[in-house]
UniProtKB/Swiss-Prot annotation:
GO biological process, one term: negative regulation of voltage-gated potassium channel activity
Tissue: Expressed by the venom gland.
Miscellaneous comment text of the record: Negative results: does not inhibit voltage-gated potassium channels Shaker B, Shab, Kv1.1/KCNA1 and Kv1.4/KCNA4.
Recorded GO MF terms: potassium channel regulator activity; toxin activity
The species this protein was found in: Pandinus imperator
One cellular component term from this protein's GO annotations in UniProt: extracellular region
Record's protein name: Potassium channel toxin kappa-KTx 2.9
PTM annotation: Contains 2 disulfide bonds.
Length: 28
């Protein structure tokens, strides 16, 4: 899970949306 958040901070300045996606992963 940490990797997901870290990726958000590295790839997205506003990790707000990214973090939400991390909490609610979308099925492929």
């Amino acid at each position: 899970v940490d990797a997901c958040y870290e990726a958000c901070m590295h790839h997205h300045m506003n990790s707000d949306d990214c973090i939400e996606a991390c909490k609610n992963p979308v099925p492929p």
